[in-house]
Amino acid sequence: MKKLIAIILALVMVLSLVACGNKADAPATEAPADEPVAVMTYAEYAAAELDTPVVIDCYVQAHQGWWFDGDAGHGKLTVYAADADGAYFLYELNVAEEDVAKFTTGAKIRVTGYKGMWDGQVEVMDGTFEFVEGDTYVAEPIDGNALLGSADMINYMNQLASFKGMTLESKTYKNDGGDDIWLTFSNNGVSCSFTVEVYFTGTDSDVYTTVDAMEIGDVADIEAFLYWYQDAADCHIAAITPAA
């Protein structure tokens, strides 16, 4: 009897060791990796929820000045971009200084970041990029006059628009000069806000010096990107021509 019990106990121990060995040899189960986000069309980007990852192919239309963010440890460049279906505002894209010269008008880039909103302005935040070889694209400005006073203007956010025969109603200098200039222009009694964004134009540009010299009541033709601020259009001026 004692011998039988000893045999049974020995078998139990052997089976236990085999089970433990199999368990130790089994590969660890890995958590499934996040699926990479596919390149989106403009319609897919527009429909994406805020604070979600986005990947877009787009074309550089213009950009603001490059600067180095010491806290982040890398350079930043804010870019106005577009494709044939819409436009994008790429806020503080991670860009090395040596790459800035390659951000020529029409250059194609692939941007990975997050869709965000600040004071009504929809933009790509925390973005990285890569240059994409191939075609180039420069968007023609849309008719801004047709959108003045229209709730439909927001559907064209970030696109370049052309405004004809705009009368200067007000002009305010941020920090008493040498910085942004805040403006109100109107056409046929409908007003719209515009800004000379110094990070975009600088103070020695034709845009800045032209606006600086304008007086209330002066008329000009304007090209501007449809930027949003405090839930209303506040267009960033890219070009301005005083009326003859």
What are these regions (language model features)?
Residues 31-244:
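OB-fold single-stranded nucleic acid-binding module
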Residues 1-9:
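Positively charged n-region of N-terminal signal peptides that target proteins for export
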Residues 21-23:
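Bacterial signal peptide processing site
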Residues 16-19:
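C-terminal motif of bacterial Sec signal peptides marking the signal peptidase cleavage site
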